[in-house]
Amino acid sequence: RGKTSEPHIVPLTTFHIKFMDEIKQTTGHDTYLFPSTGGATPRRYDTLTNAVRKFVKASCMDRFSPRDIRRTFKTVAGSMGISLELRNRLQGHAMTDVGSVHYDRYDYLAEKRTAVQAWIDGLSEIVKIKE
């Protein structure tokens, strides 16, 4: 769940699953994808923020925040032909139009799955990822 009370489901591709398996092999932990140092709990969100802040400072970048990743997804996925509605749904934005709020109960899972695969395929072309 995000900011809304609705579940936020983002389908995983085979690339994501393989990537998570590699992370688990690296950490040696099965319960949490990103375990804390002791492994008893998941790593805190601010750990990522702090690591990004240190990296930005050390690399002399002007600035960068994890939010820039969301902005990049929204922009690049649009250039790949993924509709604004699906990009919004994938980012967990609440649909506020009357039809969505009161009538549309469809989960858009199949469309999300297609969009996520298109995203991975597009990134693979950009950075030549091999699944």
Give residue ranges: language-model regions:
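Catalytic-site neighborhood detector that most strongly recognizes the C-terminal catalytic loop/helix
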Residues: 1-3, 17, 40, 80, ...
